[in-house]
């Protein structure tokens, strides 16, 4: 059993394929469900201007979810015999949750597929395009480019009331690791300078950050965005006070760290 979603009024827990959703809760209040204790978030002041949703690592085509190379320590998630494949179950559940929020946009941050096959891309489109149509915005991940493809590799700029979102391609075709090119960072800087609104940056790979205790190894084969490009992203963010954070997927976990400039760099768990 794990807690997968917490807002100011909703808590969602997953136990394999079983979902437990608790709604109409009070903000900043501690609750215990199924032996797990969690506190709802504070409700922001002011008027709600926009709602958008994001998912990543949806991995259509995967059978055993949670396997990393030859490491099968897991936890490994798979469907019950006779059920739809695990990604189909989880993504259709995610789409149902998202639809209930009436989002202006749904942003998918890469790893749409397991192996980058046409069948897997079609399965992704059948699920997400059928639910969200012109609200859908997509960027690729490493799994979507292992065969050298260039689908969904264009950086995107999304404007909504109260916020802008820059969605950036971090994939390197045929590679697991990530990068952001100098030209992309110049584009981000120009876009951020063009608006007074808050800007949230999104991509597939997580950012490298130095460990304050000095324990993070600086390596060109870092599993996320390489250290030099990660530093360059920090420099752009530091230059523009309206850039409020970077969010990624790739690691399949929830984690929040800080860039050197103090702005949050966030990893969002897989579907």
Residue ranges and their predicted role:
Residues 1-47:
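Short, surface-exposed linear motifs at loops/turns and structural transition points
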Residues 27-28, 32-118:
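N-terminal active-site segment of His-dependent metallophosphoesterases
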Residues 95-105, 175-264:
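His/acidic metal-ligating clusters that form di-metal
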Residues 61-63, 114-117, 146-147, 208-211, ...:
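Short catalytic/ligand-binding loop motif for oxyanion handling, primarily in non-cytosolic enzymes
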Residues 57, 110-111, 141-142, 204, ...:
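Active-site glycine-centered loops adjacent to acidic/histidine catalytic or metal-binding residues
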Residues 86-152, 159:
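Core catalytic region of metal-dependent phosphoesterases/phosphodiesterases
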């Amino acid at each position: 059993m794990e807690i997968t979603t917490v807002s100011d009024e909703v808590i969602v827990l997953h136990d394999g394929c079983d979902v437990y959703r608790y709604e109409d809760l009070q903000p900043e209040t501690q609750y215990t469900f199924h032996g797990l204790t969690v506190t709802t978030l504070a409700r922001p002041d002011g008027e709600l201007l926009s709602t958008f949703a994001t998912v990543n690592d949806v991995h259509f085509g995967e059978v055993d979810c949670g396997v990393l190379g030859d490491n099968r320590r897991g936890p490994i998630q798979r469907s019950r015999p006779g059920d739809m494949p695990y990604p189909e179950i989880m993504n259709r559940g995610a789409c149902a949750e998202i639809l209930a929020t009436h989002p202006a946009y749904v942003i998918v941050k890469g790893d749409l597929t397991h192996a980058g096959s046409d069948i897997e891309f079609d399965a992704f489109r059948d699920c997400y395009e059928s639910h969200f149509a012109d609200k859908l915005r997509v960027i690729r991940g490493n799994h979507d480019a292992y065969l050298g493809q260039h689908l969904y590799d264009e950086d995107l700029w999304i404007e909504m009331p109260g916020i802008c979102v820059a969605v950036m391609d971090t994939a390197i075709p045929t590679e697991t690791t990530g990068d952001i090119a100098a030209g992309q960072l110049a584009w981000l800087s120009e876009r951020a300078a063009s608006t007074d609104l808050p800007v949230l940056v999104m991509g597939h790979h997580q950012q490298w950050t130095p460990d304050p205790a000095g324990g993070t190894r600086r390596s060109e084969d870092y599993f996320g965005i390489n250290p030099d490009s990660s530093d360059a992203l920090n420099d752009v963010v530091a230059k523009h006070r309206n850039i409020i954070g970077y969010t990624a997927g790739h690691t399949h976990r929830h984690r929040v760290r800080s860039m050197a400039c103090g702005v949050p760099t966030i990893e969002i768990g897989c579907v």
